[in-house]
Curated annotation (Swiss-Prot):
The keyword DNA-binding applies. NCBIfam families: transpos_ISAs1. It comes from Escherichia coli O157:H7. Keywords: DNA recombination, DNA-binding, Transposable element, Transposition. This is Putative transposase YncI. Belongs to the transposase 11 family. One of its GO terms (biological process) is DNA transposition.
Amino acid sequence: MSIQSLLDYISVIPDIRQQGKVKHKLSDILFLTVCAVIAGADEWQEIEDFGHERLEWLKKYGDFDNGIPVDDTIARVVSNIDSLAFEKIFIEWMQECHEITDGEIIAIDGKTIRGSFDKGKRKGAIHMVSAFSNENGVVLGQVKTEAKSNEITAIPELLNLLDLKKNLITIDAMGCQKDIASKIKDKKADYLLAVKGNQGKLHHAFEEKFPVNVFSNYKGDSFSTQEISHGRKETRLHIVSNVTPEFCDFEFEWKGLKKLCVALSFRQKKEDKSAEGVSIRYYISSKDMDAKEFAHAIRAHWLIEHSLHWVLDVKMNEDASRIRRGNAAEIISGIKKMALNLLRDCKDIKGGVKRKRKKVALNTCYIEEVLASCSELGFRTDKMKNLTQI
């Protein structure tokens, strides 16, 4: 994707300011912010500083007729951007950059931006629910919710915005809801949902059907793995069963339900082989999968913690940021995910995310390489027609 294509997307976001008083174009401010975040900026002052240092380069792609806005102007403008419009642009942009292939595993999970709280205004930290493609390590979209407990309402909103056809959607127990399962099936996709106590009857049925002693000599479809790390050996057993008579009532309640899945994890110390713990996790799925596919799917879902949440915290300083004005925390979170997608997709620059950000800060040639790194699908006029209706 060319830099001009990115600018085309940015330019569609509505500017709510009084145009007669505007000194700095919204597209210029957003382009500056995206480039600065890619280059390692985490605060408003750092975004302004980047702009002053790279003004001549920025003028190649934007107007910047009145130079670089001060940090407070950047903060005020970004904080007033319509968050829903931004979310739609983000998703449309990612669909241009990343063509989802049939059968991809898409993990949906939430993360609290810890620094976004504001005690003075009695405002708690916001919670972002993201869709993450495990195959390519990119974020496909995000939706904000005011608390983790509101994920149940945020997940359907995110599902509505995404093209999920023929993919497997994995969600933890918070998203194990009948309406969410139905929504996924309506989107022509399949689900793999973790089952815990919030679905009491279903969870109890699993406990009755799959007690611990059944695993010692299980005759059905199973797949096991072993992993030795930090002096511990962990054995994981995965089993998949068709829906049995005990679960026939649940077939009517959960749209498309086909498989009952169980993951047993047994940990022991390597030296004395003493047991450290056994955990059992239950899942339901609409996909006609076997035990090996199930093992791969739940492993892929766990990767969102390290491949997305951990990277945002450690490599991109998301939790440390005190940006919290208006919609700013949500918008900057989305821009950081855009930056992360671009940095990961750029193979011309060697190194991890942190090293790439430092290289981008040192040389504008690297910025151009990163911005052009998304798959060259181009900006289609049919997309522009839809986006102008935001």
